[in-house]
Amino acid sequence: GCTCPNIDGTCGYGGCIYCSGRGSGDFAPAPLQTVTAQIEAGKRQLAAKWQSDRVIPYFQAHSNTYGEIDRLRAAYFEAIAYPGTVGVSIATRADCLGGDVLALLAEVSAMTHLTVELGLQSASDETAARIGRGHTYAAFCDGVSALRRTVPAADICIHIINGLPGET
């Protein structure tokens, strides 16, 4: 599993107010397992509800483009190689989309369908400071623009939280 620059001290400590200690991955398989083992555990967990050999591995908890590029590449490629994989979904922060990461995401996008989920939560910098997000709306927009330019085939999902204190 990855961590987050808003946890390890790069831009903050303790994370955003809405993230748990597991980085909002409370229902995900244990991150110490291999990617393959996590996919298989997830399939078992969902088997009662959905019967399918197709999977979209979801890198959810914390910031999944934040880490050593070779480790990220190995994790993404292991997921892509899993039998029945029809795409990959990667949740992260817009301020965790540096040049090496964008190049890697372009590689992933050339191999399979890619969705990148970006946590915005609020476009208000005042609210962002209150919830401890650790980056500005302008930084978010810069990250989205860079992602769209570099990986045009990727779907982008933006997470927002309606009704945050002080917003209407």
Features from the language model and the residues they span:
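SEC14/CRAL-TRIO lipid-binding/transfer domains and related phosphoinositide-recognition modules
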Residues: G1-P5, K43-W50
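Canonical Radical SAM [4Fe-4S] cluster-binding loop centered on the CxxxCxxC motif
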Residues: G1-T34
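Core AdoMet radical
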Residues: R22-I39, L46-I69, P83-L97, H113-F140
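Acidic (Asp/Glu)-rich catalytic clusters
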Residues: L46-W50, Y76-P83, L105-H113, S145-R149
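Distinct, well-ordered alpha-helical segments
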Residues: I69-F77, G98-E107
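Aromatic/hydrophobic pocket-lining residues that form the small-molecule binding cavity
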Residues: L72, F140, T168
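Short, surface-exposed connector motifs at secondary-structure boundaries
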Residues: Y82-V88, A153-I158
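Conserved strand-turn element in the central/C-terminal portion of the radical SAM core barrel
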Residues: D125, L147-T168
